[in-house]
C-alpha cells in the first residue's frame, strides 16, 4: 500500500464564523494522507498520483468559497480529493493556528 502525505501546506483562507476572519483572512494548515494502493510502484509517472495536483485540489477548495466551520472545510477537501483521485483511504486535517489560546484542528476521513 502506497500512502502519499502532503504535510504543512499553508494557505491563506477566509474561513470562520466571525466577520473579521472572513474579511482579513488567516492561515490554515493542511495535512493530507491518500492511500493509493499500488499506484506508482512500477516507476511509471503515468500510473502515479501527481503530488502537485493533490496540493492544487486542496488550494482550489480553500480558495473557492468561505466556510464557517473547519468541519465543513475539511469535508469539502476530502470530497474533492476523493472525486479526483479515488483513493482507497483519505484523511485530511485542517489546522487553524491563529486561535487564542493555542491551535485548533479538525480531521475528516473516508475509507
Please annotate each region the language model reported.
Residues 1-111:
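N-terminal, polar/charged subdomain of small-to-medium soluble alpha/beta proteins
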Amino acid at each position: 500500500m502506497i500512502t502519499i502525505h502532503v504535510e504543512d501546506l499553508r494557505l491563506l483562507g477566509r474561513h470562520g464564523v466571525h466577520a473579521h476572519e472572513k474579511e482579513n483572512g488567516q492561515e490554515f494548515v493542511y495535512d493530507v494522507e491518500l492511500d493509493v494502493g499500488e499506484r506508482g510502484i512500477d516507476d511509471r509517472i503515468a500510473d502515479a498520483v501527481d503530488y502537485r495536483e493533490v496540493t492544487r485540489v486542496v488550494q482550489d477548495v480553500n480558495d473557492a468559497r468561505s466556510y464557517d466551520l473547519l468541519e465543513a472545510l475539511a469535508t469539502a477537501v476530502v470530497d474533492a480529493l476523493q472525486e479526483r483521485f479515488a483513493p482507497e483511504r483519505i484523511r485530511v486535517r485542517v489546522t487553524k493556528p491563529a486561535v487564542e489560546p493555542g491551535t485548533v484542528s479538525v480531521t475528516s476521513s473516508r475509507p
